Amino acid sequence: MPGGMLLRGFRIDPARAGAGAARLPCLAHGPVEVALRQNLTLLVGENGAGKTTLLEALAAACAIRPGGGGSYAETEASRPATALSAAIELHVSGHRPKGLFLRADRFAETMAASGRLPMPGTGARGRAEWRLADEQSRGEGVLSLLSARVDASEQLLYLLDEPETGLSPQRQMALLCLLDSLHRDGRSQALVATHSPILMSHPGCDLLWLDQDGIARRPLEEIPHWRDLRRFMRDPQQALRRLLE
């Protein structure tokens, strides 16, 4: 197993979930067990597959709150995921890992609460990183924050929900390079929920597909997001005729 595997896997038994827990389609047929093989894992699926909720439940199980640092803080919006975390059995290497959990759709809220959410690296540098990110667009702010953490070479478990949100294709490529740096460094680990075929194309990542049948590995060529975009780009005019006729 490669270095940086802070989280080696997890098991989810929906029968153990707390009251009001989110119901994930991938748990429709009972418990699911996932072994993580690479320190860069991408969670992929259609809208409503439960990628965000799964990441948030994993954050709660690891006691990683949005923005990183401290204990997980439940909110009204996160309550279903927090209840689901009771159903998760973590397979960790040693102690429960420190980490960074970011949801792109709540980045502004996280930044607004930055005074209460210290980075794993605290002090003047950490506050400067928050200020820099706060002055940028949402997509660029997420990218700057991640860049500062990866450059610091801290050993962290990154739980990232759609970090490509708000980024142009060119900046998604920059994000891909950033994730590659994390992957090559080998000390940290990232689980990334994404719809981006650009991120999915990383040659060293593990792709996990979520649907009503569970959670399963798939090669890139079998991921609809990547396959359909490739088909469209090969012959846009033919694809448009089929779509619009």
Regions found by a protein language model. Give the residues of each.
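ATP-binding Walker
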Residues: 48-49
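C-terminal lobe/lid and adjacent interdomain/linker elements of RecA-like ASCE P-loop ATPase modules
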Residues: 170-245
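Phosphate-binding P-loop
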Residues: 31-38, 149-153, 184
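The Walker A (P-loop) glycine that initiates the GxxxxGKT/S ATP-binding motif of P-loop NTPases
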Residues: 45
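Conserved ABC ATPase signature
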Residues: 99-107, 113-114, 119-151, 157-174
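Residue-level preference for the first positions of well-ordered beta-strands
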Residues: 40-42, 155-159, 189
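ABC ATPase nucleotide-binding domain signature region
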Residues: 40-42, 52-119
